[in-house]
Amino acid sequence: MNKKIIYGFLLVAFAVVGCKSGENKEVTVEPEQSVSVAKDSVVAVEKTEASVELVDSTKLADNADKKSYEKVIVDTLIDGVKFKRYYFDIRTDELADETMLVLPVDGNADANKKIIDRLLDDYSFDADSIQQQLEAQFDAYASGNFAEEGDDYHESELLVYPLAVVDKKYVSYMLHSSLFWPSEQNHPQWADVYFMFDLNTGEIILQDDIFDASAENRQAVGVKIHDELVKFAGNEEDIFAEAGAELLNASFVFDDKGMTFFYQPYEVGPYMLGEPEVHLSKEWLEPYLKKDGILYDYWFKN
């Protein structure tokens, strides 16, 4: 993956989280149901990926040059909804580049296109020709016709995959992007961003679709999040974000039990805190929800 594209995303990711309130054979795999947004649903996806047979994989290896390439394009079923998984792994003396995109292909084609365009907006991919674009880039590397002149050895990752499908109506996504130049950096630069989408419309779900518009209610949720962050950190001094509605960021997911907010390094506290997560139960959130909103309808009217 071109480093300029990755750098662009890393910059955009921090801005968004900080400011916004060949021939394909098919195989379907039914994964274990996820039981927790923050941890177990990620594990469920990992189990799903591990259990999918690599039925259309291409592996090229040249031991003399220490080059290795892997390409996988396969259909997979996650919580009853079909996705297509694209996996491209390139390892040479100059770079290590891993790309995995797990994208919706079930149901409404226009909705799927909206989701894909939103997820890959910072990567110059076209939803209508994404496979051709990925294969062209992979083939260029594999044939030795692609070079990033002047670069030292570097590593990059772009992983975009669903954490869970919720009630076959909504899908939560994680987008992980990282870059690392060992000769220049002590650790990788990375960003993890989370999204919720309506599978029927392709629209991204925002805070305004969930919470009551009153400032008092949103302030109360923000104060609760701050309290949970303090518990996570162990003391209030390590949380420099103020208690309030500003903590209701755009990086969140939900499931049948509640809602989880995710924060980037340095967003709410020092680097040593990592990426804090705050889970709020649906029972606690009920008084603050928009009564005609998505979550109130899903949690309390079904």
Task: List where the protein language model places each region.
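Sec-dependent signal peptide recognition
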Residues: 3-10
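Enrichment for repetitive, rod-forming helical segments
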Residues: 10-11, 27
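Generic detector of low-complexity/intrinsically disordered segments
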Residues: 12-13, 231
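C-terminal motif of bacterial Sec signal peptides marking the signal peptidase cleavage site
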Residues: 15-18
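Compositionally biased intrinsically disordered regions enriched in Thr/Gly
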Residues: 22-302
